[in-house]
Amino acid sequence: MKACERLLLKIESQEKFVEEFKRILLELGLTLKEFSEISGIPYSTLYKVIQGKDFRVSTLIKILKTIRSFEKDENIDTIAIIAARPALNKITTRKIGINGKSYLIKEYPANSLEECIVAAVRAEREGVKGIVCAPIVSATIEKIVNVPVAVIIPEKDAFMKALEIIAKKINE
């Protein structure tokens, strides 16, 4: 059953509706803030929904339309990005077009080697077509999963900026 249909079936009870909406957000890998940005529903309105407060039918319609748009995207190939949360926060889009083909981007936060491996296995199980990760974990991940793996190589400017920061700290 599609997420949209599941949510509508829970409309009879506010508690069940809120519980199902939270579950759908988890399945989509979205925070309430991200859902707000995608749907155009103000964050404060969505917060009221999550708190079990009454809301307008127009809000329900927008929620359902947004969830449906993700269901349509299920046929689009997904690429996983495994990185620390601060790096993932710099990603501003959920969909990207490359060579005329659209891809969904799914974030997998990880802060250790073990978390990267777990995220890679989870991503593969969830059906991603490829994984982007840091060079230090790519060799290990390539041995574990059966999807293509690409690495993120920091730009020269990133290294220079880090060197400048550490030099300032040393001289303080």
UniProtKB/Swiss-Prot annotation:
According to the entry, DNA is bound by residues in: 32-51
Check the record and name the PROSITE patterns matching this protein: HTH_CROC1
**Can you give the residue ranges of the HTH cro/C1-type domain?**
21-75
A Gene Ontology molecular function term for this protein is: DNA binding
**Superkingdom of the source species:** Archaea
Q: Which UniProt keywords apply?
A: DNA-binding, Transcription, Transcription regulation
Query: What SUPFAM superfamilies is this protein classified in?
Result: lambda repressor-like DNA-binding domains
Q: Name one Pfam family in it.
A: HTH_3
Q: Which Gene3D superfamilies match?
A: lambda repressor-like DNA-binding domains
Q: Is DNA-binding among the key words of this record?
A: yes
Stated name of the protein: Uncharacterized HTH-type transcriptional regulator MJ0621
Lineage per the UniProt record? Archaea, Methanobacteriati, Methanobacteriota, Methanomada group, Methanococci
